[in-house]
């Protein structure tokens, strides 16, 4: 068996022969990471990515200075979508080791689920995986209902049914209730709503290959909110939370939805489809209607919703939208505590009115006159939140997935956002 490469930490600079900007050096005992006190977690993550790039697949984190955050930073950079990596963790106290183990179980589940090929992960499989994860952490407190296919149409989940009907794999709504109180009449503290588009071709507004090749990851919002609920439970969440996952393929067929179709929702709103590639908001609307009906204190929806958010923030930040300044501030505080990147983008009352249609109350995409695509998408969603000005957060999760490796991440899913939402739920 190959001996594990020892990885140690030092606050001293590397030997001058390695250069004055060296973040790691190699010696007879292994590899030393040289911390400078400026961005130590980022330095560790970037160094781990380089170590993986050297083909080193077995490491032992040894010596002083390792804690949960530094171990996790190393793993975030070291983990990749191919091959097996083995880490021998340093001695941590029981609480730190439990926290690390929970991250390894749940956030790795999120990353692996998002990375799964669309052929292996359809709408039903995504819903079932979510149920399995949550049952693994709190099965006695979990009940759920899966509604799919024509049952969605019969129960008037018209956004989800319309988008998903073009695929041979039926669309699915997962409604999951985490109720640790044991009281079936206990108030619902929070609702989480996730976009679970397991493959997005764009429909008849078809994507080019360069924009379609990563669309197995278009269910990243659903995976992330599922992981967030599971992780919050491991941190002691004792309030009732409901999870709604809106799962579908967006494909082309003789039965697929078309431009000019009008979707009539249960809350009385109707929306004209002028871009079948703006499908995420159409399925989320059904989940938000259900979430609002619970009258929770907090609604969070999460979706890989717009290219506009990526244009603004790249893959480096999740975009946050809210009319509730206090709640947005709480989310950003949670993000800072968890060392996760969120950035608030504008959402104003006028964005709700920038989706004009000649034939319906709403258009599912903005016109050239209203180019703030991420904000108008959030404005669209607000029409399906009963009290949209208070207690609602929309996260356009641009940092969910990377098509290519960068200095701190392998290609694929990042798992970012799980800890922040869990932090907010348990604050």
Swiss-Prot record:
The note on the cofactor says: Binds 2 manganese ions per subunit.
Active site per the UniProt annotation: 207, 281
Kindly state which keywords UniProt assigns to this record, in alphabetical order: Aminopeptidase, Cytoplasm, Hydrolase, Manganese, Metal-binding, Protease
Q: Where does Mn(2+) 1 bind?
A: 200, 277, 279
Q: Which GO terms describe its cellular component?
A: cytoplasm
Biological process GO annotation list? proteolysis
Keyword check for Magnesium: no
EC top class named in words: hydrolase
- The answer to keyword Cytoplasm applying to this record is yes
State a single Gene Ontology molecular function: metalloaminopeptidase activity
| Entry EC no(s) | 3.4.11.23
List required co-factors.
Answer: Mn(2+)
Q: Please give the PROSITE patterns that the UniProt record associates with this protein.
A: CYTOSOL_AP
Q: Which reaction does it catalyse?
A: Release of an N-terminal amino acid, Xaa, from a peptide or arylamide. Xaa is preferably Glu or Asp but may be other amino acids, including Leu, Met, His, Cys and Gln
Compartments (UniProt record)? Cytoplasm
State the Gene3D superfamilies in the record.
Zn peptidases (3.40.630.10)
What is the recorded function of this protein according to its Swiss-Prot or TrEMBL entry?
Probably plays an important role in intracellular peptide degradation.
Output the PANTHER family linked to this UniProt entry.
LEUCINE AMINOPEPTIDASE-RELATED (PTHR11963), PEPTIDASE B (PTHR11963:SF20)
Query: Belongs to which family?
Result: Belongs to the peptidase M17 family.
Assembly and binders: Homohexamer.
| Name of the protein | Peptidase B
Show the taxonomic lineage.
Bacteria, Pseudomonadati, Pseudomonadota, Gammaproteobacteria, Enterobacterales
